[in-house]
């Protein structure tokens, strides 16, 4: 099973909507750029029927070097999280186990 890429998304827009390939590629890039920009501005991204992208601050915490066992601090950082919406969860769960 492969992964859906931005190029494949653009190809599907080209095929399904009749956009030319350049327009389809620009549309996909613009969509993701808007998500990136909103997150950079510390905004939550809510895609109805799909899910939410949020920013979460993680505190500094103790870690360990796996090779030496030495304790080292893991620095505080901000991470992007995704929570799938109920409709997406239901669709994925409906298809679970139907494909080899």
From Swiss-Prot:
Gene3D superfamilies: IHF-like DNA-binding proteins (4.10.520.10). It holds the Pfam family Bac_DNA_binding. InterPro entries: Hist_DNA-bd, Histone-like_DNA-bd_CS, IHF-like_DNA-bd_dom_sf, IHF_alpha. One of its GO terms (cellular component) is protein-DNA complex. This protein is one of the two subunits of integration host factor, a specific DNA-binding protein that functions in genetic recombination as well as in transcriptional and translational control. Keywords: DNA recombination, DNA-binding, Transcription, Transcription regulation, Translation regulation. This is Integration host factor subunit alpha.
